[in-house]
Amino acid sequence: MSKRIYSRIAGTGSYLPEKVLTNDDMSKIVDTSDEWIFSRTGIRERHIAADDQATSDLAYFASLKAMEAAGVTADEIDLIVIGTTTPDLIFPSTACLLQARLGNVGCGAMDVNAACSGFVYALSVADKFVRSGDAKTVLVVGAETLTRILDWTDRTTCVLFGDGAGAVILKADEETGILSTHLRADGSKKELLWDPVGVSVGFGEGKNGGGALLMKGNDVFKYAVKALNSVVDETLAANGYDAHDLDWLIPHQANLRIIEATAKRLDLPMEQVVVTVDRHGNTSSASVPLALDEAVRSGRVQRGQLLLLEAFGGGFAWGSALLRY
């Protein structure tokens, strides 16, 4: 009987643009304040990509760090999967652009669009390739320049988001790694969180073809908490664990209140929850790998620990991954 093959995270990396926009800076752009933003979201500041930076640039720098941490060269990568909702171009994919810049020739490369859940979705896709034996080394990235699709006159949305990228290298392993991933969606709720322009339905006037992120925050909050509770319970039960077995919860960094609600539901102390939303804002698909990389590099996350990753985003699309780091 053949052994089970796991996909193990062999290295992590992240990149944040140099420009930082604080809440006080935001108060000069729209009618808001540090107290208003922080009390509702837990956000203090966010990073903004430079005018000459695209999503693939952020992904590239995060990937280099993950590759270095894993001791992997570009020609060893069998597959590149990027979770993003802000690709450089309509096509080719941002993953193809990243492949070329890394100097890899011939490996598969694809983008996955699941909004803020993009990295968890990309991780799930990559995990299946490794477990099936079709790939031994996979680069998985979550990267966004979400500030490019914001309405900077709408104080309810423009204060929430930032730019960044996080990456992991997955390697085939017979001992440990990703235990399971669980993906869910509900397209009937699209108008609660969306950008209503596109190639097929058409574009409007102005920057980005009139595209701008629209969100009904209270409705999103209520749905997200219930959906995340459900998928987290499903993930733990599928592997014979309960919340008290977890070493770390690494959630999507959208809103501190959602993070705290999930932790409370799991009866997890916040000391076991990785929180970066205060310094990064909501970086969409980049938020989970950014938080993971920070926790690894700070020494909090150690080899052998049990980690639960979860995310929720537009679509709605949400998901989770349970892994032994």
Swiss-Prot record:
The active site is at C116, H252, N282. Residues 253-257 are annotated as: ACP-binding. Pathway: Lipid metabolism; fatty acid biosynthesis. One of its GO terms (cellular component) is cytoplasm. InterPro entries: ACP_syn_III_C, ACP_syn_III_N, FabH, Thiolase-like. Keywords: Acyltransferase, Cytoplasm, Fatty acid biosynthesis, Fatty acid metabolism, Lipid biosynthesis, Lipid metabolism, Multifunctional enzyme, Transferase. It is found in: Cytoplasm. GO terms for molecular function: 3-oxoacyl-[acyl-carrier-protein] synthase activity; beta-ketoacyl-acyl-carrier-protein synthase III activity. Its main location: cytoplasm. HAMAP family: FabH. Belongs to the thiolase-like superfamily. FabH family. Homodimer. Catalyzes the condensation reaction of fatty acid synthesis by the addition to an acyl acceptor of two carbons from malonyl-ACP. Catalyzes the first condensation reaction which initiates fatty acid synthesis and may therefore play a role in governing the total rate of fatty acid production. Possesses both acetoacetyl-ACP synthase and acetyl transacylase activities. Its substrate specificity determines the biosynthesis of branched-chain and/or straight-chain of fatty acids. This is Beta-ketoacyl-[acyl-carrier-protein] synthase III. It comes from Xanthomonas oryzae pv. oryzae (strain MAFF 311018).
